[in-house]
A protein has these predicted regions:
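Beta-strand-rich interaction surfaces with strong enrichment in secreted/lumenal proteins
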Residues: 32-33, 71-76, 88
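Surface-exposed binding patches on compact interaction domains or structured appendages
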Residues: 52-81
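Surface-exposed loops/turns
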Residues: 37, 78, 92-93
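Non-cytosolic beta-sheet module surface loops
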Residues: 49, 88-90, 104
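Long, low-complexity ectodomains and other extracytoplasmic segments of secretory-pathway proteins
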Residues: 19-40, 44-46, 52, 107-131
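Ligand-binding face of N-terminal immunoglobulin V-set domains in extracellular IgSF glycoproteins
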Residues: 82-88, 96-101
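Bacterial N-terminal signal peptides that target proteins for export
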Residues: 1-7
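Bacterial N-terminal signal peptides
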Residues: 8-16
Length: 131
């Protein structure tokens, strides 16, 4: 086999042999709005394995211990949707913006998600009669 044929064969195998995994989502940020102080808030991110191979999530990291995450521990088939559930423990008053990094075989860089809102002492309801 000539060098030209060998290079062509190797190039064809590297391009067509493996379709990269990819994670996609409609929303990378969920705004929780007002959250009552000391009342945890939970949000679900709906994601999709939009690659051609099974997706394996190796790790999910948060930027602080006040946020917990639940995610699939098994391989996610190509084209399948899956959920990443996050819970923020609202123990501090004020605005929050928590980052969640999803590490997988979809690439070297994590997919970043964020959960934001504002922790308040009580939620004001503006319904009722006005003078």
């Amino acid at each position: 086999m000539t060098n030209r044929h060998m290079v062509s064969l190797l190039l064809a195998l590297s391009v067509g042999g493996a379709q990269a995994q990819e994670i996609s989502t409609v929303n990378t940020t969920i705004d929780c709005g007002q959250v009552v102080f000391k009342q945890p808030v939970t949000a679900e991110f709906v994601l999709n394995n939009s690659g051609g191979q099974p997706l394996i999530i190796s790790d999910v990291r948060t930027d602080c211990g006040c946020t917990t995450v639940s995610y699939p521990k098994t391989a996610i088939p190509a084209g399948e949707r899956f959920k990443v559930t996050t819970t923020y423990d609202a123990k501090q008053m004020g605005h929050f913006n928590k980052q969640i990094g999803i590490y997988s075989n979809a690439g070297d860089n994590p997919m970043m998600l964020s959960l934001k809102g504002v922790v308040v002492p009580q939620i004001s309801d503006f319904q009722g009669e006005y003078p």
